[in-house]
Amino acid sequence: MDYYDFWKKELDLDKKYKLKGFSRGSLRTGFILLPCRIFLDAGVPSPIKPNAILITHGHQDHIDCLYNHLLDNNEKVQVIGTNTLIDNLKDYLNSCRTMNVGYKIKFDKWAPKSILNNLIINIDNIKYYIETIKLDHEVECIGYGLSEIRNKLKNEYNKLSSIELANLKKNNIQIIEEILYPILFFCGDMNYTSLLILPFNSYPYFIIECTFFQLEHIYDARSKKHLHIVDLIPYFQKYINTIFILIHFSCRYTKNQINEYKKKYNFSNVIYWI
């Protein structure tokens, strides 16, 4: 695969935000939200430099390119994850740096940020609210809900003229309030039991794994704590106003096979990220 082939597929989420990326189970997973350049996992080489990186868990196919993402940046990039993951990534990045220079050294070209439940980050003078949900996987794993924080005129002042609003401002009356503009939810790898706790009604887009399709692979899904298409179908049917972006297909399926499953399991609110 050519270097730039990873980034050929893209999707306009709305008038402002665009999603690009690539994902195959046990191979590579990584997405970029543009124009803010927020990376969702770090398993794919990229010509674009990140402003922030959200890491769901530490499996190699999700962090394989983290070290390279962090090099040659003018500013230290925010890398967000759980406390345990951040501690492990420190050791991982130190080892990467050591192997590249040939002697023991610490890697310091990053800004690690541990997240417990939620976090606010600032990118290009825009604030983003990040919420997390713990997922059941082979290792500690979380999903990320991402929203932009926008300013909105309070409802009680909607009918006032610009002159009246200006007078209120002069009197130090707060006429603006912050609201959340949900963008997407990015799920890490997970067992089917985690589906019960996900906020499908709260985000317009849900990027979620669908590792297995064949019925005989349900056992593999259970033993490896991944999702099978049959786990997801009830949620496609229930949350018809949510768009599901399916990723992380097992490498045992060819592209042609996945397209056949796409025809078989065809839902108007489902996008197969092939």
Cite the ranges covered by each PLM segment.
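Active-site environment of divalent metal-dependent phosphoester hydrolases
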Residues: 47, 60-63, 87-88, 138-140, ...
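Extended recognition/assembly regions associated with phosphoester-bond processing machinery
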Residues: 1-29, 115-118, 130, 185-187, ...
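Conserved beta-strand hairpin/beta-sheet module of binuclear metal-dependent hydrolase folds
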Residues: 1-51, 142-146, 152-153, 176-187, ...
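Divalent metal-coordination and catalytic microenvironments
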Residues: 40, 57, 79, 130, ...
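Active-site-proximal loop/helix segment associated with metal-binding centers of metalloenzymes
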Residues: 123-215
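Metal-dependent catalytic neighborhoods of phosphoester/phosphodiester hydrolases
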Residues: 65-72, 91-92, 254-262
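Active-site metal-binding motif and surrounding structural segment of the metallo-beta-lactamase
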Residues: 39-87
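Binuclear metal-ion centers of metallo-dependent hydrolases, dominated by the metallo-beta-lactamase
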Residues: 102-124, 194-274
